[in-house]
């Protein structure tokens, strides 16, 4: 092993790795990042958006709810549709576009498709680069029908 973690984190359920994913409007993967399972989602959000050529709308779940991230997306020329965290107080949920938020399922569907590959869902690879290669291969297989 090397001096860094190979993006394998520890949780009460055992070793874990998160895949942070950006998809296009058709649900096809554009870019992804790996992180340790115990790391918070918002830590990798700006890096993921930075990799995108064009940012129109960022739709994300409550894990990405942060005002600095919303400002970052606005600076890139996009808008955010992110569910607000409750923080134990009443929040105006009418400010979020619920019709657009329904498209968040495109990301979940992409995860469901790659989790069909056993080597990805259970992560047999010890090295981060090998696991990232397998995830990339699965995403390429999702793109393949577009060109055949």
Predicted regions and their residues:
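Basic, amphipathic alpha-helical segments enriched in Lys/Arg and hydrophobic/aromatic residues
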Residues: 71-72, 76-79, 97-148
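Polybasic low-complexity intrinsically disordered regions
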Residues: 1-86, 134-138
């Amino acid at each position: 092993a090397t001096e860094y973690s190979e993006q394998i984190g520890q949780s009460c359920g055992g070793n874990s790795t998160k895949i942070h994913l950006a998809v296009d409007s058709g649900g096809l993967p554009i870019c992804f990042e790996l992180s340790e399972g115990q790391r918070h989602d918002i830590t990798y959000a700006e890096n993921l958006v930075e990799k995108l050529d064009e940012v129109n709308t960022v739709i994300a779940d409550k894990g990405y709810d942060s005002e600095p991230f919303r400002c970052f997306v606005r600076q890139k020329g996009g808008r955010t549709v992110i569910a607000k965290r409750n923080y134990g107080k009443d929040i105006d949920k009418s400010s979020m576009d619920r019709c657009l938020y329904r498209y968040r399922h495109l990301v979940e569907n992409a995860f469901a498709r790659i989790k069909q590959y056993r080597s990805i869902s259970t992560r047999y690879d010890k090295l981060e680069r090998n696991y990232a290669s397998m995830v990339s291969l699965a995403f390429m297989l999702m793109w393949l029908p577009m060109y055949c």
